[in-house]
């Protein structure tokens, strides 16, 4: 983990410098040159313990009743006693071509060009819910306290600012999550993508999601 942390620390150094600033200022001052963050969820390693969900809620102060991250369990696969479950991560895909960004009338939903992270500026959000309707992955919600759109931001305002990995990655006991710079061929995530077969959910939509998945069974691709 130390090696992978070092791979992306250069990309989050600026984030630490702007800790505590308002969302609008953060969006304008980020300068993470050459970084395009992505994540891999290895379904063959995920055990559905939901430690990632708990860590996300705690670190990002997500109220009960809503969630930035959900682990969905499939129907039983196989026959007793060899029954297995597939666990599917439902969260923001941080699309390069994000429909939520395209429909936002105020510019509150944006894709940070320097890091690739899709985020929401709460100072600009008017709660119109256009982005929620446009997202084909159904991962956005209205925050019950701020009344603005919310979702996974790869812990951009919390762990990344502190030079840490996203909370879900740090909490996973089976190392089913890998996070890093997709544009760095030597990063842990780039090496993993070369080594294992992966798929991306609803890729045919042309959104270019940056959440990759190692399938539950090799050769099995879910759409």
From Swiss-Prot:
- Write down what this protein is called: Protein NrfC
The species is Escherichia coli (strain K12)
Q: Does the keyword Transferase apply?
A: no
Q: Which residues bind [4Fe-4S] cluster 3?
A: 92, 95, 100, 135
What InterPro entries does its record include?
4Fe4S_Fe-S-bd, 4Fe4S_Fe_S_CS, Cyt_c_NO2Rdtase_NrfC, ET_IronSulfur_Cluster-Binding, TAT_signal, TAT_signal_bac_arc
Function description = Probably involved in the transfer of electrons from the quinone pool to the type-c cytochromes.
User: Which positions does UniProt annotate for [4Fe-4S] cluster 2 binding?
Assistant: 56, 152, 155, 168
The residues listed in the UniProt record as binding [4Fe-4S] cluster 4, with positions renumbered to this chain, are: 104, 125, 128, 131
The residues that hold [4Fe-4S] cluster 1 are: 46, 49, 52, 172
Q: Which domain of life is it from?
A: Bacteria
Post-translational modification remark: Exported by the Tat system. The position of the signal peptide cleavage has not been experimentally proven.
Question: Does Iron count among this protein's keywords?
Answer: yes
By its UniProt entry, which Gene3D superfamilies does this protein fall under? 3.30.70.20
């Amino acid at each position: 983990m130390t090696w992978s942390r070092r791979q992306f620390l250069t990309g989050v150094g600026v984030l630490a410098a702007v800790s505590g600033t308002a969302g609008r200022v953060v969006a304008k001052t980020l300068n993470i040159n050459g970084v395009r963050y992505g994540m891999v969820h290895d379904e063959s390693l995920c055990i559905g313990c939901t430690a990632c969900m708990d860590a996300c809620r705690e670190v990002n102060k997500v109220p009960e009743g809503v969630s930035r991250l959900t682990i969905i369990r499939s129907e039983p696969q196989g026959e007793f006693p060899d029954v297995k479950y597939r666990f599917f991560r439902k969260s923001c895909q941080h699309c390069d071509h994000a429909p939520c960004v395209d429909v936002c009338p105020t510019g509150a939903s944006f894709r940070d060009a320097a890091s690739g992270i899709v985020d929401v500026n709460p100072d600009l959000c008017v709660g119109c819910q256009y982005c929620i309707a446009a997202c084909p992955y159904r991962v956005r919600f209205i925050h019950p306290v701020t009344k603005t759109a919310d979702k996974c931001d790869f812990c951009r305002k919390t762990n990344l600012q502190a030079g840490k990995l996203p909370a879900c990655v740090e909490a996973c006991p089976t190392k089913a999550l890998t996070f890093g710079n997709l544009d760095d061929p030597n990063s842990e995530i780039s090496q993993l993508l070369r080594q294992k077969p992966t798929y991306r959910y609803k890729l045919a939509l042309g959104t270019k999601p940056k959440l990759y998945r190692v399938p539950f069974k090799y050769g099995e691709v879910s759409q």
